[in-house]
Amino acid sequence: MTMRAARLSGSTGLTAALVAVLLVLTGCASLPESSAPQALGTIDREPTSEGPTPPIAGRDPDLLLRDFLQATADPTNRHLAARQYMTPAASAQWDDSTSTTIVEKPDTLLESRDGDRATYRIRAQRMAELSADGAYRAVNEPTLENKIEMVKVDGEWRIAELPDGVVMDITAFTKSYRRYVLYFADPSGNTAVPDLRWLSVPKNQLTQRLLSLLSEGPHGAIGAVVRNQLAAPVALRGPITKANGDPDDVGVGLGGVRLDFAGAAALSQRDKELLAGQVVLTLAQADIPGPYMLLADGRPLDERYATNGWSAADVEYLSPSVQAQNRIGLHALRDGALTQVTDNGVVETPGYFGSVNNLQSAALSPDGQLVAAVADAGRPAPEPPRTLMVGTYGGPAFPVAEGGSITRPSWTGDGSAAWAVIDGDRVIRAVNDRATGTVSVQGVDISGLTADPAGPALRLPITELRISRTGVRAALIADGKVYVAVVERRPDGGYALTAPVPVAVGLSTKATSLSWIGGDTLLIAREGNIDPVSTVLIDGSEWTPVTSQNLTPPVRVITAAPGAQYVADSRGVLELTSNTTSELHYWTEMPGLVGTDAAPVLPG
């Protein structure tokens, strides 16, 4: 492996994950709509636990330590499973709440052993840190080293001294924890913003845990730029039950969920819909099936759903994966012009962008009505060789900025602005006024990227910038490394990029291109022949190589949407396809898009 995070495989490949989401949505949407909801039992009732498995008798101390690093992945009862490996005194002194570190390849190194006492040092590669609220943060920090004192108690080795905080092996983490998604609302209230959490919770406690986390709000810097309808003065009122009022095993099997929100009756109709969207999307993604009977101060939150309850289909329009669907088809650059890929072949688009031969990169607004492109100005040095052009699809265009280098433009989800980076250190927004047809250029404050007090500053230049469809996050490549930053709108109307978080931690080669898939996953291309294309979640977890079958590196450009991924390699443009009779994935050449100057273009 050339990247450590590849070992985190809490879910299967990207395609399987997307299929799972669709199954959740369609499954919930197919519930009967003509009758009142009934509790149908607990088909997948979980077995009652009889407590954690005790340590193996007669275990050698080094093997006992390895078992301990597996047991720490069970957080139940303040890590009772792990405390069994300690002496009573050590268990009483150990504070498991200070930190949680996920490691790989732990070594147990013997430093000394004398009769019934032994000293070991655990040495392991840090992979991530896990917050108390389940937020995962990938790290690339020095090797972890913990000194462990062990003694024999009644003939069995036990841990007598250890540092505070939880250390767990990645293999145990992926078995015990599962990824969940909390949803909050973007500032405009038009889309749901994902916030990933990793939890180890029994199914019959999961509904309560997720709603508690929703009420606590988003994690980290994203909290400043999203809306949370499940926040004061709105709060859960009374017990969480099944749809028929049964309080037992809520979320286990069929039967739905009944929730009452105090203070929600005073919300506007739109805010009630956003509250329902947050709750229903969060629960549906966690495989907690509906119907979802939502009340506001004891009465239906919305009379339209008073009888049959809400389903995932009722709020899926807020899902970032649904909004990121490509609705205008594939386009491409070929011979310096913008073309459209049709059933009859590749044809030039009308207007300016299809008639020129000097385009280096291009981006389409989500509705396909606007185009931003970087053109080779053809000017001799020292004049700036690149020009950012903005115009209508099929119509004219005009220059809005110039520079020595300009990144591939990226449109916001509403098509109001195209973002780009000039000369690697200046971020701009080309703001389109559809009423007047004019475009103005607005600078973006990036001081929060290079001097972030909350974490390590990134190093310029920025060579790629992609705005998420939710509008509150930006993925970027700086000095060959991948980050996800927060898009912050200032009170004066200006914008800033802040709080960069490294996500593709440990890449052995530089990243060259990236694209959003939905709202929480990135597709990344990098230099080299080994795993040149991969996916990673926005918290840095689940780094997964994508097949390289039929690719001829280097991979120059990638672009993606849910269910559609394209790359441009040394031969031309290829699409990720799958065998209809197996799970085999491979890249297929796109007819008519061959050559080193061809590049795929999707909305965004």
UniProtKB/Swiss-Prot annotation:
Mode of membrane association: Lipid-anchor
Entry similarity comment: Belongs to the LpqB lipoprotein family.
Annotated lipid attachment (S-diacylglycerol cysteine): C28
The entry's keywords: Cell membrane, Lipoprotein, Membrane, Palmitate, Signal
Entry keyword Lipoprotein: yes
Record localization: Cell membrane
Entries under InterPro entries matching the protein: GerMN, Lipoprotein_LpqB, Lipoprotein_LpqB_C
GO CC terms, sorted: plasma membrane
Stretches the record annotates as Disordered: 35-60
Protein name in UniProt: Lipoprotein LpqB
Entry-linked NCBIfam families: PRK13616.1 (NF010141)
Keyword RNA-binding on entry: no
Pfam family, one: Germane
Record organism: Nocardia farcinica (strain IFM 10152)
Coarse class of the protein's main subcellular location: membrane
Lipidated residues (N-palmitoyl cysteine): C28
SUPFAM superfamilies in the record: DPP6 N-terminal domain-like
Extent of the signal sequence: 1-27
The organism's place on the tree of life at top rank: Bacteria
